Amino acid sequence: MSYDIAKIRADFPILSREVNNKPLVYLDNGASAQKPQAVIDAVTRGYAEEYANVHRGLHFLSNLATEKYEGVRAKIARFLNAPSEDDIIINSGTTEGINMVAYGWAMPRMEAGDEIVLSIMEHHANIVPWHFLRERQGVVIKWVDVDANGDLDPQKVIDAIGPKTKLVAVTHMSNVLGTVVDVKAITAGAHSKGVPVLVDGSQSAVHLPVDVADLGCDFYAITGHKLYGPSGSGAIYVNKARMAEMRPFMGG
């Protein structure tokens, strides 16, 4: 398949600028993607023509904003092949999504000595929340190393699961190496031991077709700004069983 690179670049206004008298070349999409004109236009239109509180009013603009908001939830559910729109929690990104799981699901059911299994290739968004839980409740983090090629062996993750393990939390694709992790195999092995699985899908959702129904994971977190969407946007898929166990981690 061939791509018209000039046409693709033309979709991104920022790529028309120059840096040091040369056309801008941006190679940091792994951290955050630039925004195409369609996204910029949609955000501008939202503030200029459609803005109001979501789920907080009965007037025209509030109903319109709510309809748009719920439309996004439906699109995310289809994008991830979630069984239901009710499985999608919209948030500010993967970091908030993982914190939702840490404080709204893990903290109420974990005590000192309980274990969380992580790989050493995790992004800080999938490390720091668990360190906070370790400091607050004395949970134990078990680390699984990668091989010489930077690959994560699913069996090593499964073997790390013990009788006190309460959660496995792994990335689907490394933000540093680009390594793709077989989270379907990890999920199957973890579930055979009665342990839920959280997947950090920040990178994989951009590059791979994601089917949470096929993967079987309990949680799958994504970030909008890496998917060419606005900053401060994201979502987490939570399966029906885990959703019933979730508690709000913020109030107001």
Segments (PLM) and residue ranges:
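Pyridoxal 5′-phosphate
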Residues: 1-252
